[in-house]
Curated annotation (Swiss-Prot):
Localisation: Cytoplasm
Cofactor binding comment, as recorded: Binds 1 [4Fe-4S] cluster. The cluster is coordinated with 3 cysteines and an exchangeable S-adenosyl-L-methionine.
Gene that encodes the chain: rlmN
Domain of life: Bacteria
Protein known as: Probable dual-specificity RNA methyltransferase RlmN
Residues where [4Fe-4S] cluster binds: 137, 141, 144
Amino acid sequence: MSATPLVSQVDSHNPEKSKLIPPLLGASVAELSAWVQQQGQPAYRGKQLHEWIYDKGVRSLADISVFSKQWRAEVAEIPIGRSTLHYRSVAPDGTVKYLLRLTDGQIIETVGIPTFAERGEGPKARLTVCVSTQVGCPMACDFCATGKGGYKRNLARHEIIDQVLTVQEDFQQRVSNVVFMGLGEPLLNTENVLAALKSLNQDIGIGQRSLTVSTVGIRDRIRQFAQNNLQITLAVSLHAPNQALREKLIPSARAYPLEELLAECREYVEITGRRVTFEYVLLAGVNDLPEHALELSKCMRGFQSHVNLIPYNPIQEVDYKRPNRDRIEAFVNVLKQQNTAVSVRYSRGLEADAACGQLRASKN
C-alpha cells in the first residue's frame, strides 16, 4: 500500500475531502489521525505520530519505533520537514545563532536567547526564539543587515516551526517565547505565519501571549491580521516619528503613509483588545533628538501602545552609530514626560552578529 501525502487541512466530519500535501511538521493531531487512517492505520497512531514529531523530535518516519517495520518502510520517504544545521555560534551572554540549511539549499538564520536567573547562574528562566519568515527580506531598511542580501522566497509553515524545535532540542529546554523578528517581513507571508502561530500554540504548547509578530507595516495587512482575533503581541517597526524621515530609513514607507499605518494600529487595538508595541531603533544624530521623541509621543496618543527603544547595533555596510547613554536617557525622559509607555531593549547576541538588525544568514 503506497503512502498518501499529508493531510494539511482536515474536515473532521469528512477526512477524505481534505487537501493532501506534505510535509508533516505543522500538522495537528486531527490532521495526522486522518492521514494515518488513510494509510489503513488506527486513528490513535495519529496521536503517537504527533508526539514523536513535536516531543521526541524525530526527523524520519523510519525512526518511529512504535510503528511496524513494514509501515515505516512504506512511509519512509514522506518528509517530516526538518532542516539541517549549517553553522552555530555562541555569544558570551549565552545567545546562540543558528544557520539552518533548508531542503532546497537556502540558508536561514535563527537565534536562541536564554534568560538566566538573577545572578546569571542556575537554570534558564526563559528561552526565547527569534524566527525568520522569509529567505532574505524585500524591505531593504537602510540600517538593517537583513535586507542587504536580497530576497529569495517565503518560508513554508514547517520551515518556521522547525526553527523553534531546533533551538528547543539544542538547549534541551522548552521554548517559552517566540518572536517573529528574524529574516523577512512576516505580513508578506501571512498564510504561513498564521499557520505556524497556530501550531506553535496548539502543537508545541506556547501561549498566544508569548508569541510576537513584528512588521514594518504593509498596507491593509495589520487590519487583516486583526480579523483572526489572536492574543499575540503585534510589534510595529516604526523607527521614525514622521513620514519624511521614515521614508529615508524604510523605502517601503513611501507606499504606506505613517498616518494610515497608525490608523490600522488603532483598529488592531479596537478589534483585539491588545496593545501595539512600536519598535524604534535609535540612530545617533538621525532620529534620537528630543524633538523626535516629542513627535513620537504624539503618534502614540489615543490608543494602547508601548514604545520599545532599541539602541542601534552596528553593521559593516552603513555608517550609522549608536547614541550614547545620555542621549538615550534624554529621549526616554521626553517620552515619560508625555506619559508615553516606554522601555529600552539592549539587544542580546551582539558578539555573534545575532542582535536586532544584524541577521543576514551568513557566518560573518
